[in-house]
A protein has these predicted regions:
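Periplasmic peptidoglycan-binding/tethering modules of Gram-negative envelope proteins
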Residues: 1-19, 25-120, 193-211
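A broad, low-specificity signal for short, low-complexity segments enriched in glycine/proline
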Residues: 81-84, 122, 148-153
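Periplasmic OmpA-like peptidoglycan-binding domain that tethers envelope proteins to the cell wall
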Residues: 96-104, 126-211
Length: 211
């Protein structure tokens, strides 16, 4: 009954602990206070959830701006990968169809990639930990391959692309929360310079040599 007045709120009860997650911080805290009054012996924790739609739209806008700011005549592979990693590709559950909203980012990236020689880009797919691990690995590969195939359809040389699926391996957030699962369902890009063989894993914040 308490949750009826709190839309978009998730309650998880584990042993003597209740965890509340929702978009409205004030509403979540008010609900927590009510629960504490009813069950004083339980521990109630609150966490503000993530607005998925807003997060996705902002990430796509950031990626588009980053790609648009690159000089096509002086572009570096790391710059392209960094911009690509700004976007969130939020696949529908169980699907490997690229959302239409992300295609403009991939279009921009493809145009730039065609100007960069001697570079391979590995597209890495990840899922959350929900469901069967083997099925998740298969799905993550299909999603990564979909991204690679789309770039090829826009003129990128297939030899520049490699798709890998890791499934639920290497989580970057807590798989017990909706927000954590959302963050773990992701596509990452890794650049390999074919002249040196050096692989560089790129995120929005950093570049890391991996071998």
């Amino acid at each position: 009954r308490l949750l009826k007045g709190s839309p978009n709120t998730t309650l998880t009860w584990t042993g003597s602990e209740i965890a509340l997650q929702g978009l409205d911080a004030n509403a979540i805290q008010a609900l927590a206070d009510k629960i504490k009054a009813i069950t004083p012996n339980l521990t109630v924790k609150t966490q503000q959830g993530i607005d998925v739609s807003q997060a996705v739209n902002t990430s796509i806008s950031d990626a588009e701006k980053a790609l648009a700011s690159l000089n096509p005549d002086q572009v570096k592979p790391i710059d392209i990968a960094t911009a690509l990693n700004l976007q969130i590709i939020n696949f529908a559950t169980g699907s490997n169809d690229i959302p239409d909203a992300n295609k403009s980012v991939l279009d921009q990236a493809a145009a730039l990639m065609n100007r960069v020689p001697n570079v391979e880009l590995t597209v890495k797919g990840f899922t959350d930990a929900t469901g069967d691990a083997n099925a998740n690995k298969s799905l993550s590969l299909k999603r990564a391959q979909s991204v690679a195939d789309y770039l090829v359809s826009k003129g990128v040389d297939p030899s520049k692309l490699n798709a890998v699926g890791f499934g639920q391996e290497n989580p970057i957030a807590d798989n017990t929360t909706d927000e954590g699962k959302f963050k773990n369902r992701r596509i990452e890009f890794e650049v390999t310079n074919t002249e040196t063989g050096v692989q560089r894993e790129v995120t929005g914040e950093s570049v890391k040599q991996t071998n």
